[in-house]
C-alpha cells in the first residue's frame, strides 16, 4: 500500500486531496465516517413548535469539514495506506504534526466509528464524545449510510427540511437518546 506525504486540501470530513503528488490523490481516513457535505442534523432543543416548522438545522457535513481543515491547517500530512475502498479510493491512517486525524474527529464528535475492526482508543474517544454530546452527538442525525441511500438531492443547495423528513422515516439512528438532555454534560474539559 502506498504512503502519501505532503500538503493536503480537505474535501470533506473524512477525505483529503494530495494535489501536489502526480495527478493528485484522494485519500479517505480509515475507521471513521462523517456526515456528507450537504447533510443536515437537527437541534433536539425544539421548544417553540407553534412558531417554528422544524428544529433548528445544524450543518454537520460542513462542520466536520471545518474541524478537519482546522486540525490540518497548512501543515504537511502523512497517510499510510491500509486498503482500498469499494470506490477505489485509498483508505489510510493519517497524521498531521503527530495528531491522528481520525482519532481527533472522533474525539470532538464530528465522526463515528465505521469499521468492523474497532480500535480501542477510537472507541473510547467516540464514547466520551457521545457522553459529552460533542459535535453531531448533540443533534438528531441520520446514519450516514442510510442518508447516502435515501437522499435524492445531494447538492450543496439541499434544504434542511429534506433531512427532517428523512429522519421521520429513518430505519436506524445514531443519535444518542435525549432523555437526559437537561442534565449537564459529564465532561467539562472543552
Predicted regions located by residue number:
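A structural motif
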Residues: 40-41, 135-138
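Bulky hydrophobic/aromatic "packing anchor" residues in well-ordered structure
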Residues: 29, 105, 129, 175-176
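Conserved beta-structured recognition patch
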Residues: 87-136
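Mature, structured domains enriched in cysteine- and short glycine motifs
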Residues: 112-117, 138-190
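Charged, low-complexity, helix-prone segments enriched in Lys/Glu/Asp/Gln
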Residues: 61-66, 73, 121-134, 158, ...
Amino acid at each position: 500500500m502506498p504512503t502519501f506525504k505532503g500538503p493536503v486540501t480537505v474535501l470533506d470530513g473524512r477525505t483529503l486531496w494530495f494535489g501536489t503528488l502526480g495527478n493528485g490523490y484522494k485519500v479517505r481516513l480509515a475507521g471513521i465516517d462523517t456526515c456528507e457535505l450537504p447533510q443536515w442534523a437537527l437541534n433536539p432543543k425544539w421548544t417553540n413548535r407553534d412558531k417554528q416548522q422544524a428544529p433548528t438545522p445544524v450543518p454537520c457535513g460542513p462542520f466536520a469539514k471545518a474541524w478537519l481543515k482546522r486540525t490540518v491547517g497548512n501543515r504537511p500530512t502523512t497517510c499510510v495506506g491500509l486498503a482500498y475502498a469499494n470506490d477505489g479510493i485509498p483508505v489510510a491512517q493519517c497524521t498531521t504534526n503527530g495528531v491522528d486525524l481520525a482519532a481527533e474527529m472522533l474525539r470532538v464528535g464530528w465522526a463515528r466509528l465505521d469499521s468492523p475492526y474497532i480500535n480501542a482508543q477510537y472507541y473510547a474517544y467516540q464514547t466520551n464524545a457521545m457522553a459529552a454530546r460533542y459535535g453531531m452527538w448533540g443533534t438528531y442525525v441520520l446514519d450516514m449510510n442510510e442518508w447516502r441511500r435515501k437522499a435524492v438531492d445531494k447538492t450543496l443547495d439541499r434544504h434542511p427540511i429534506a433531512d427532517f423528513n428523512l429522519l421521520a422515516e429513518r430505519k436506524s439512528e445514531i443519535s444518542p437518546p435525549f432523555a437526559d438532555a437537561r442534565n449537564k454534560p459529564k465532561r467539562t474539559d472543552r
